[in-house]
Amino acid sequence: MDHKKFESLIKQLYSTVNELESMFPGRHFTPDGHMVGSIGESLVADAYGLELMTASNKGFDATSTTGKQIEIKASQARSAAFRSEPEHAIVIKILPDGSFEEIYNGPGSLIWRQFSDKPLPNNGQYQISLNKLKILNEQVVESMRVPRVI
């Protein structure tokens, strides 16, 4: 894959969003839903050298070169949602310029423990704030992280 072309296309997309929002004040053109998920999964797969599974794969989105199953969560808001305990999770926040900030990169068990005393929400998804994930990320030792390749 052409990493530079991919990066350029994502930046163009977010630049277009910013231009449209400037042209039409009060209107939001922010990508959401499946588009954000697919963009996030692609950004992470590219940056960490992961192999993506088919879309909507149950339980994980990609595998690492060592075979680790990775759930990828991308947000433009303040939280991420989990339906089940992942083996490993990488959570990112997509920034307005199309780049991303790594919020969490570590074992899924550390996240899942946060839900242990909570009833399952009606929508079947536990929510966790990006701020809480940043705090949890500080507890992850380097050897437990999936390293970036670019």
Residue ranges, per PLM feature:
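Nucleic-acid endonuclease domains
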Residues: 1-150
